[in-house]
Amino acid sequence: MLVIGVTGQTGAGKGTVCKMLEKYGLYHIDADKVAHSVYKKGSDVLSALSEAFGEDILNTDGTANRAKIAEKASAENTEKLNSIVHPAVTQKIKAIIKEQSSLGTKGVLLDAIALFESGENRFCDFTFAVIAPEEMRLERIMVRDGIKKEAALRRIRAQKDESFYKNHADIIIKNYPPYNLDDEVKKVLLWAKL
C-alpha cells in the first residue's frame, strides 16, 4: 500500500489538497485529529502536558484546553510539546496504516504538520509539502480558527520556514496565484501513478 506524506505550514492548504486526493481512493490520516485523540481526559499525554506546561492547560472538567495548549506551544516550547505528544500520535498512526493496509486501501495520505520533525516521514513512500505566502496563510488561519492576528502569527512563527519544506519534501505544491491548484496536485498523482 502506498503511503504519501503531506506537510507544510499552517494555513497553506494541506487539508484542501488532501480532499482533492481522496477522490482517487486515498485514505486521509489527519495527524492533528489523531493528536487530539491522545489528549483524552486522564490520559498519560494530558498528564505529562499538564506537568510540563502547567495546570491551566486543563479546563475545569479536566479536559484539554486546546487553545491554551496552542498558546503555550510558542517557538521555544514546541520541542517540549512535540516530545510528549509525538510518540503517542506515531503509535496511533502506525495502527491506522496497518488497518488500512489490511482493508486493501489503495493508499493513505499521512497529513502531518511535523512530518519530518516527528520522524513519521519514514513510513512514507514519498512526501509533498504545500506552501503559500505568509500573508495568505495568516488570513486563512484567522478566518478558519476565528483567532486574532497576534495568535495566528504566534502559530506561524512556531513552525519551520518555507525553506525547510523545500529542502525536505520530494514535491512542493504551490497553493497561491498564479499557480493552479489542480495542476499542482497532478504532480502528486504522477508520483503516485494514480
PLM regions and their residue ranges:
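Hydrophobic anchor at the beta1->P-loop junction of P-loop NTPases
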Residues: 6
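P-loop (Walker A) phosphate-binding loop of NTP-binding proteins
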Residues: 9
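ATP-binding Walker
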Residues: 12
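Walker A/P-loop
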Residues: 15
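Post-Walker A helix-loop "phosphate-sensing" segment adjacent to the P-loop in P-loop NTPases
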Residues: 23-31, 43-44
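ATP-dependent small-molecule kinase phosphotransfer cores
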Residues: 36-105
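NTP-dependent small-molecule kinase module
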Residues: 95-107, 121-130, 134-147, 161-194
